């Protein structure tokens, strides 16, 4: 029998599908990536073609093995991590989607959300699903498809249609329609799942008129769900044995599996999650309560806060403001000045996320004087990412009563040393940047590997988690508080800027 030397992680993201091969020491052996089309049928609407998601993801899987010259019988298991909330409904018989995937960013269900608020559902939804009422989550998207595709609700009741988030869709395709499952982390983002009873919530299904028959079975994040045959050399059947939504996978990949450990992912936006162990902490500060993975992939809970504009504000400096040619230049220009000369940039281009949740806030630059130049504005834009992260962390500490000792970081913007140092300064906390930057794929690989005994336990993985650089606070508390107070003042003035129709 061929030795099982590798784990494959499939990382199905918002703009691309990736496959990553890892060895027993968690080294990345090979990566393959394919982008796919973003479909914008109307302003504020975002769709993907589910068949293209499948085509790009399945081809990266074949490609990544060919690239590394690995045969499929050397693969111990496959783990899947995915863009969360994105919603697909397909025919059980043919495997054909009845509509495009409605993406997490899509705002088309705002009206359904307004109805839920008017019907007084906010408290129920917060208490039982851990979420706020927002078009972001899957529940209202499923309702929209059933409302708009003729005859679909009746077909769903007859068991002819299936719903799934992207993980569920991929596993259905990989197992030729034999397995219809999701995991607790993805289920917790649907607004249809009771995070306390760990079952689909009958009241939510009733309110949104979604037949239970179309929902997947919900399982742990680390167990064998089914087998797939990916052909290639060997043509062996490989267990699919790990699933987690992208942010929860990153939390696990950073080994934040104990209560009070937190990570922040700096991508287009920032996603910060803090593990709260076995207790679901209800937020009084605008955060979400969500399910995360404990040390063996069992259910833990986490608080989550999302910042809408992180890397996106650096892209704005580059593409719209033309102040930099490349995102990497931002660090160089930011360090050409000692400070921002009193300038604050509030990048509320699409409103503000946690903990403010103000869709009517708009971007602003405050504190301009004649002495302000482009470098000050670049620096202030980078600093805004760190300030927004502190906003979320303060909310987490208030909700959980846990004081954070270190923040683990990942995502594209963590390569910026200026930003990471300022993040540590403004939090007054250590910031730890890992050697392996692919922590989302790493999380999926860990979950899959633990389920099949490729790794025995997390202790084995702890040794492999190398911190490449640690940033420590370099400013005094008074200075930190003074700067943060300026930020709070700026945010206050940017809020409620857009008129909203009463």
Curated annotation (Swiss-Prot):
Record-level GO BP terms: glycerol catabolic process; glycerol metabolic process; glycerol-3-phosphate metabolic process
First-tier enzyme category under EC: transferase
Q: List, alphabetically, the InterPro entries matched.
A: ATPase_NBD (IPR043129), Carb_kinase_FGGY (IPR000577), Carb_kinase_FGGY_CS (IPR018483), FGGY_C (IPR018485), FGGY_N (IPR018484), Glycerol_kin (IPR005999)
Q: In which pathway does it act?
A: Polyol metabolism; glycerol degradation via glycerol kinase pathway; sn-glycerol 3-phosphate from glycerol: step 1/1
Binding sites annotated in the UniProt record for ATP: 14-16, 268, 311, 315, 412
Task: Give the catalysed reaction(s), semicolon-separated.
Answer: glycerol + ATP = sn-glycerol 3-phosphate + ADP + H(+)
- EC number(s) in its UniProt entry? 2.7.1.30
- Gene Ontology cellular component terms for the protein in this record: cytosol
What keywords sit in the KW lines? Allosteric enzyme, ATP-binding, Glycerol metabolism, Kinase, Metal-binding, Nucleotide-binding, Transferase, Zinc
Q: Domain of life of the organism in this record?
A: Bacteria
Positions annotated to bind ADP: 14, 18, 268, 311, 412, 416
Task: Tell me yes or no: is Signal among this UniProt entry's keywords.
Answer: no
Which residues take part in binding glycerol? 84-85, 136, 246-247
Modulation of this protein's activity: Activity of this regulatory enzyme is affected by several metabolites. Allosterically and non-competitively inhibited by fructose 1,6-bisphosphate (FBP) and unphosphorylated phosphocarrier protein EIIA-Glc (III-Glc), an integral component of the bacterial phosphotransferase (PTS) system.
- Residues the record lists as binding sn-glycerol 3-phosphate: 14, 84-85, 136, 246
Q: Which Pfam families match?
A: FGGY_C, FGGY_N
Per the UniProt entry, the signal peptide is none
Q: How does it assemble?
A: Homotetramer and homodimer (in equilibrium). Heterodimer with EIIA-Glc. Binds 1 zinc ion per glycerol kinase EIIA-Glc dimer. The zinc ion is important for dimerization.
- Any idea what job this protein has? Key enzyme in the regulation of glycerol uptake and metabolism. Catalyzes the phosphorylation of glycerol to yield sn-glycerol 3-phosphate.
Q: Kindly provide the name given to this protein in its UniProt entry.
A: Glycerol kinase
